[in-house]
A protein has these predicted regions:
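Surface-exposed, Gly/Pro/Thr- and Asp/Glu-enriched linker/hinge segments
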Residues: 30-41, 73-74, 80, 111, ...
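Ligand-site clamp/hinge motif
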Residues: 32-76, 229-231, 492, 684-712, ...
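Local pocket/hinge segments that shape ligand/substrate recognition
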Residues: 36-37, 47, 70-177, 193-201, ...
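Extracytoplasmic/peripheral linker and loop segments enriched in polar/acidic and small residues
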Residues: 47, 119, 131, 231-240, ...
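Aromatic- and charge-enriched surface segment that lines or borders ligand/interaction sites
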Residues: 54-62, 108-120, 124, 446-511, ...
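Periplasmic binding protein-like
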Residues: 55-70, 75, 79-84, 225-284, ...
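Long beta-strand-rich cores associated with HINT superfamily self-processing modules
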Residues: 274-277, 347-392, 402-405, 660-671, ...
Length: 825
């Protein structure tokens, strides 16, 4: 991943969404002197396909933890086993990805090309059955991309509740029949026929996960009942990358896919990318992937709305929240991606392991966990971690790292400009801490200094900002350089090359432009419209000028600050290979051209990088973007270091993180990362310990009248604890719904005393209640950890003067018996 920051990073979740082998870097004794990096010296990721076997290995001590959910039916026993500790994660989801393309063959009918048929699936899918039977109660029904535990959920709850989806196969069948008949299909003998051909649906199921197979069989059974023939196909994520995400949708190699997201790579308070990733074509995550040679799903309205969210094109918090709500509403109506269940996934680690950070987005697979983990009592400085898959997609930083397995490991070896607080989701400084944020937004502008520069692809040189150039905001940051893992010190040349790459590959100058990728370029081009240039004040001080404003200034910093995550020479070598047509950065580009997806962790591709580096050395090559910045001698030194690294490690993953990737053993199914102990690394051992324990809120009681008189004001009291003590360091929101599920009142409870919050249900609010049962949902969130505790109570409303004896709520946990996005899993 290159120029990080929301400007590139608001698309990097989804789009671009990174040693010399001297003994000093690998010597544990040396590491103890330097006290830099993680507590542990080594982590070994070991392929385990059987979840039950992996659980037994954690029990026995053969594995220290398992970076994949254990079977739900085994979770209760695991909680009672003193050898284990269970960590619950609630960020993941299950659903269906639906192909809306008309068939290339006019005699073949794809029912899902009709929005009405796709939408009807929401009534054909029994979400409660999925939660209760397939997930064994470890989850909750879901129809939106955020889920009830996301900070964004409070912005969309009224929209979500308004759909009122319930399992209703008769209604679904009627809706589908109307659409099929209108399209010219007939139902003969209980089977749908079009132009003499049986209407067949190609259903792709992930066979590497039983719950996805069960979900697939569930929807297959329902579709067969209403007259469709089902062609079942099975495979893992590797196959899905080809069949589902990499093929031309009009060829109908797939029509429904059982899709799972493991959650986001980090917890995000104001998630700018999820609406676009899940619903909008422009981000290259919808059918067709924006590949110009394919049929592509198109929705200009969703593109416009989600781009405003992604690039902060709003003037207030209220406007942004409305945009998010509008995007979710239209996405649900379009039903190209249908969400079914939010998962509560139990992960396990040995009870001897200390310091894991259960990030609200990534769970214990977060970057923070291995930065802070330690093994208690036995002096063990090496951990063995079971993983479900060892290699399911490309590790290239431009169009790869899209699956849980590669992303979680890669995050350990490459640091980014900023990161996210694991419990509040706020932007925090990482390798490019900001020293100043200046903004005149949302309306006014800053005049740019004359020495602000940006890369001009046509001229192939850096150009200065023109006279009269302006920007909404300026972020000043100071990169924390260290040595790359191959031993060469990072410097401003790496920053400038990352800056260059975003412009070069984010701009399409037309036919003949070889620095274009079908997925990366269209997404990045939208971000580039907001980049006004960079000012390299000093090697370690950079000013970034952007047309971005946010009501939370930390989000501006996260947008403007960037950091290089791989050495410029490795990126330059890959460019030469890709522009030569030998490999492609993105999955769909590779498939369309009939070439391989560039994957620097694979030895064969690393050898290609090595060969290109040797050519660059022989040519005395200096990239145009770095001419006048580095000397030939400096370039050659870089080439030699990267060549040596590839020769010694068999891959081209060269990062700057707290760990380096030592080796990828394909036959043995292992990836080994070792601590990077060089004194240049900026963070000492124990730096991240503050994130070990979240301060969670809990609703201890809700006092609500059993019967409420319509149109009469009603007081409600909510008692809240934070970390086990009554506290007002929390936010309490409430939503009242009538008998039809429509939200008729909402608000924020006010603190009366430590731990006591008052809700004043006014006469105007009470007038909107339905006679009979209504519902009040209460969300209590600690201000230090934004995972809500949720209470739901029934309010019986009646006209006239009736008794109002007090009762307490029937508090329930939305996730079944467990108390309380995204990478593909």
């Amino acid at each position: 991943m290159q120029k990080r920051g929301l400007l590139a990073s608001s698309i990097v979740y989804v789009v671009v969404l990174l040693f010399v082998t001297s003994v000093a870097f690998e010597n544990p004794a040396f590491s103890q002197v330097q006290e830099k990096g993680p507590h542990i010296d080594q982590a070994r990721f070991i392929h385990r396909t059987d979840d039950n076997l992996a659980l037994e290995e954690v029990k026995s001590g053969s594995l220290d933890m398992y970076f994949f959910p254990i079977p739900h039916e085994a979770a209760n026993d695991a909680r009672n086993d003193p050898r284990l500790k269970v960590y619950d994660t609630t960020a993941g989801s299950l659903g269906f990805f639906v192909n809306p393309a008309p068939a290339a063959d006019p005699n073949i009918l794809n029912p899902f090309q009709f929005k009405e048929v796709r939408y009807a699936l929401n009534y054909l899918i029994d979400r409660d059955f999925v939660v209760n039977e397939i997930l064994k109660g470890y989850g909750s029904p879901l129809i939106d991309p955020f889920g009830i535990y996301s900070p964004e959920y409070l912005n969309i709850i009224e929209t979500v509740e308004s759909f009122g989806f319930r399992y209703n196969p008769s209604l679904a069948s009627s809706m589908i029949s109307d659409a099929m008949i209108a399209a010219g299909a007939t139902n003969s003998g209980g089977r749908w026929v079009f132009n003499g051909n049986t209407v067949t649906i190609n259903l792709f199921m992930r066979q590497d996960d039983p719950k996805k197979v069960s979900m697939g069989e569930l929807v297959a059974s329902e579709l067969e009942k209403i007259g469709f023939s089902i062609q079942r196909d099975y495979g893992d994520l590797n196959k899905a990358n080809t069949v589902v995400y990499g093929s031309d949708p009009k060829n109908l190699q797939w029509q429904i896919y059982t899709e799972e997201f493991a959650g986001s790579r980090a917890f995000v308070k104001y998630n700018p990318t999820i609406p676009a990733q899940m619903y909008a074509p422009w981000l290259s995550r919808m059918p067709g992937s924006q590949n110009p040679t394919y049929w592509n799903y198109q929705n200009a309205t969703l593109d416009e709305i989600t781009q405003k969210i992604a690039f902060f094109n709003f003037t207030s918090e209220q406007e942004r929240n409305q945009l998010v709500s509008d995007a979710v509403k239209m996405g649900i109506q379009e039903s190209v991606r249908i969400f079914v269940a939010q998962k509560t996934d139990p992960f396990v680690a040995s009870a001897n392991v200390r310091g894991l950070v259960n990030d609200f987005g990534a769970g214990i697979t977060s970057k923070y966990s291995l930065l802070n983990v330690r093994s208690g009592g036995d002096g063990n400085l090496s951990l063995d971690i079971g993983v479900k898959q060892i290699h399911q997609g490309s590790w290239n930083t431009i169009g790869g790292l899209q699956d849980l397995y590669s992303a979680s490991i890669h995050s350990m070896v490459a640091d980014t400009a900023t990161f996210r607080h694991p419990y509040t989701g706020e932007v925090i400084p990482f390798r490019s801490p900001w020293t100043d944020i200046t903004t005149e937004g949302p309306v006014d502008k800053i005049d740019l200094p004359s020495d602000v520069i940006k890369w001009n692809q046509t001229l192939q040189q850096w150009v200065q900002a023109g006279e009269g150039s302006t920007a909404i905001s300026k972020v000043t940051f100071t990169p924390l350089y260290s040595k790359w893992h191959h031993g060469i010190q990072m410097n401003v040349s790496d920053m400038m090359y990352a800056d260059y790459f975003t412009y070069e590959w984010g701009t399409n100058t037309g036919p003949g432009d070889r620095t274009v990728d079908a997925e990366y370029t269209p997404a990045v081009s939208e971000a580039l419209k907001l980049s006004k240039g960079s000012r390299y004040v000093a090697p370690d001080r950079i000013e970034s000028y952007i047309d971005i404003w946010h009501y939370d200034e930390k989000e501006i910093a996260g947008s403007g600050a960037f950091f290089a995550t791989e050495p410029w020479e490795v990126l330059a070598a890959s460019e030469r290979i890709v522009t030569d047509g030998r490999l492609a950065y993105s999955r769909s580009e590779a498939q369309a051209k009939g070439i391989e997806w560039y994957d620097p962790i694979v030895r064969e591709h690393a050898e290609m990088v090595k060969g290109e580096l040797q050519k660059m050395k022989n040519e005395q090559f200096v990239p145009p973007a770095l001419r006048g910045i580095i000397t030939i001698e400096e370039a050659v030194k870089r080439y030699d270091a990267s060549i040596s690294w590839i020769e010694n490690h068999g891959h081209a993953i060269i990062g700057n993180g707290a760990f380096y990737l030592d080796n990828f053993n394909v036959a043995g199914g292992t990836i080994t990362i070792n601590a990077f102990r060089d004194f240049s690394y900026p963070f000492e051992v124990g730096h991240w310990s503050q994130y070990e324990t979240p301060q969670l809120a809990e609703i201890s009681s809700v006092n609500v009248p059993r019967i409420v008189t319509i149109s009469q004001p009603t007081p409600i009291t909510v008692n809240v604890e934070v970390s086990g003590r009554p506290s007002s360091n929390a936010t309490v929101n409430y939503f009242v719904s009538n008998k039809d599920g429509i939200v008729v009142a909402r608000g924020e409870a006010q603190p009366e005393s430590p731990g006591q919050f008052n809700i004043d249900l006014t006469s105007e609010m009470a007038a909107k209640l339905s006679p009979g049962p209504n519902q009040i949902k209460i969300f209590a969130t600690s201000n230090e950890a934004l995972r809500p505790d949720i209470s739901s109570s029934t309010i019986l409303a009646a006209p006239g003067a009736l008794g109002s004896s007090q009762g307490t709520n029937n508090k329930h946990q939305v996730s079944g018996d467990i108390s309380a996005v995204n990478t593909e899993q």
